[in-house]
Design a protein with these regions (language model features):
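Hydrophobic packing residues in well-ordered alpha-helices of helical domains and bundles
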Residues: 6, 10, 37, 41, ...
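Amphipathic, well-ordered alpha-helical segments in soluble domains
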Residues: 9-19, 47, 81, 131-134
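Short terminal or interdomain "cap/linker" segment that borders an active site or interface and mediates
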Residues: 150-169
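Alpha-helical membrane insertion/targeting regions
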Residues: 2-16, 27, 69-72, 76
Length: 169
């Protein structure tokens, strides 16, 4: 179930980005505090990359993102990365493999927290949806010609709640 949700979120992103031009993808948007859609996408993609890097090393560190500017400026490259990450997720087993999460909230100290791959994949879905909501606002305000899936940037719990409300009325 978590794997399917992850793949669905990445497909939504891929489908949306396939409609954008490079100029739209890289344009600094006032409604996004002068960040671009590409910057939000890079941030999201790099979290997935940190997860898979951590899966191979045993320690995830989301602060150790590479901040690869190609992801925020080159749509073709980014679309290919999304496909590669989807492939990795699709081939991951739904096991709860133990892994450690390194967190650092100040300059001097860090903590190691025990977690597992599936828990972190759940976090990837929620984190992605959060950034997709911001991307959605940027597109709705600036690029009205882009078609946005009705569920893009909407939490699964909100989608279910809206469905329940529509059934009960």
């Amino acid at each position: 179930m978590t794997i399917n949700a992850s793949l669905s979120v990445l497909k939504q992103l891929h489908d949306l980005l396939a409609q954008l031009t490079t100029d739209e993808y890289t344009q600094k948007l006032p409604v996004l505090n002068e960040s671009s859609i590409g910057q939000h996408v890079r941030h999201t993609i790099e979290f997935f990359q940190c997860l898979f890097e951590g899966f191979s090393t045993g320690i995830i560190n989301y602060d150790a993102r590479k901040r690869n500017l190609l992801i925020e400026t080159n749509l073709g490259y980014t679309l290919q990365l999304i496909e590669e990450i989807s492939f990795l997720i699709n081939n991951a087993s739904e096991g709860h493999f133990p892994i450690q999460l390194k967190v650092n909230f100040d300059d001097e100290n860090f903590e190691i927290i025990e977690t597992n791959f599936m828990r972190e994949l759940v976090y990837m879905v929620e984190h992605s949806i959060h950034h997709f909501a911001l991307i959605r606002v940027g597109i709705q305000v600036n690029f009205k010609h882009i078609t946005i899936d009705s569920d893009f940037g909407v939490a699964y719990s909100t989608i279910r709640h809206k469905q329940e409300l529509s059934v009960s009325h």
